[in-house]
Each structure stands twice: as structure tokens, then as C-alpha cells.
């Protein structure tokens, strides 16, 4: 409820686009485990919190996720279709490092820098390096650690 009320207030008078990371935010992230994304455990509490935001005026939910290989884009989309279908297909940015050989923080920074919008942008991520990189380069973006989703 805390995060819902926070976003409700932020979006009260301004269109707000929320970019949500997948690994570690809405799906479990196990370091060192195989990249079998379709079988990742959904983090239901976070998914439920985010699904409630879809009903808020001025709020649009997007996915911003990185994967290592091109075939994982389809796996992540299938996972979203199964566990979080409220993330519309045309609002999913899943970037493969196979085609873009850069760090996750650079890929997310480049993506967010490429947005040409006057809307308020929020990023929810679990990776402190990514959050710090965005904070240092894109001051206007509002950042939340994934733990903020937990009541």
C-alpha cells in the first residue's frame, strides 16, 4: 500500500511512466543459476503491487530488462505473458547483450537517455550499480530500489 500511495501522489498531476526491471524485481534472481528464465519463480507480492498501479490515472507501466542471449527475449516475454500480462507487449523493452555487447548499466542508461519525452520517468531496479549510474547521469529520473515495493 505504501508504494501505491507514493506513486498515486507522484502521478496525481503528471503523466508518469514506470520502467520495471524483471530479474530480482518481479522474478527471482539466483546468482550462478542457469539462464532458464521461463522457470524463474515469480515474486507475487511485487507483481501484485505493480498490477494495482495500472488502474491509476496518469500511470503507464513498462518493462526495461537485459538478457545475455537473443533467445531469452522470447523466454522473458512468455514469462510476462504468464505471470504479469498487465505489462503490455508494446511496452516491453528487453535488450539482449548478444546484439549489444555492453554492461547492463550502460544499456539501461542508453535506453533511458534515448527517450524523448516530457513525462515523469520512474525506474524500479534491484541493482545498485544501475541505480547509481542513472542517478549520476539522468537527474530527472526518479529511482526506486525494488525493496520499496514491499509493504
Where are the regions that the model predicts?
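A short acidic (Asp/Glu
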Residues: 29-33, 73-76, 132-136
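Short, acidic loop-to-helix structural element flanking the phosphoryl-transfer center
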Residues: 33-63, 70-74
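Non-catalytic pre-domain segments flanking phosphatase-related domains
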Residues: 1-20
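Substrate-recognition "cap/lid" segment bordering the active-site pocket of phosphatases
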Residues: 67-119
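Short coil/turn segments at beta-strand junctions that form active-site/ligand-binding loops
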Residues: 14-17, 57-60, 118-121, 139
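Acidic, Mg2+-coordinating phosphoryl-transfer loop and its flanking beta/alpha structural elements
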Residues: 112, 117-151
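Hydrophobic "anchor" residues
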Residues: 25-26
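Structural beta-sheet core signal
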Residues: 63-65, 123
Amino acid at each position: 500500500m505504501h508504494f501505491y500511495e507514493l506513486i498515486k501522489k507522484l502521478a496525481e498531476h503528471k503523466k508518469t511512466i514506470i520502467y520495471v526491471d524483471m530479474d530480482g524485481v518481479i522474478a527471482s534472481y539466483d546468482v550462478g543459476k542457469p539462464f532458464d528464465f521461463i522457470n524463474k519463480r515469480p515474486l507475487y507480492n511485487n507483481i501484485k503491487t505493480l498490477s494495482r498501479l495500472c488502474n491509476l490515472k496518469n500511470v503507464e507501466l513498462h518493462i526495461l530488462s537485459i538478457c545475455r542471449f537473443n533467445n531469452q527475449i522470447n523466454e522473458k516475454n512468455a514469462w510476462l505473458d504468464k505471470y504479469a500480462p498487465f505489462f503490455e507487449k508494446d511496452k516491453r523493452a528487453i535488450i539482449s547483450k548478444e546484439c549489444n555487447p555492453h554492461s547492463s548499466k550502460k544499456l539501461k542508461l542508453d535506453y533511458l537517455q534515448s527517450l524523448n519525452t516530457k513525462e515523469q520517468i520512474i525506474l524500479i531496479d534491484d541493482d545498485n550499480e544501475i541505480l547509481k549510474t542513472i542517478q549520476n547521469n539522468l537527474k530527472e529520473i526518479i529511482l526506486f530500489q525494488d525493496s520499496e515495493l514491499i509493504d
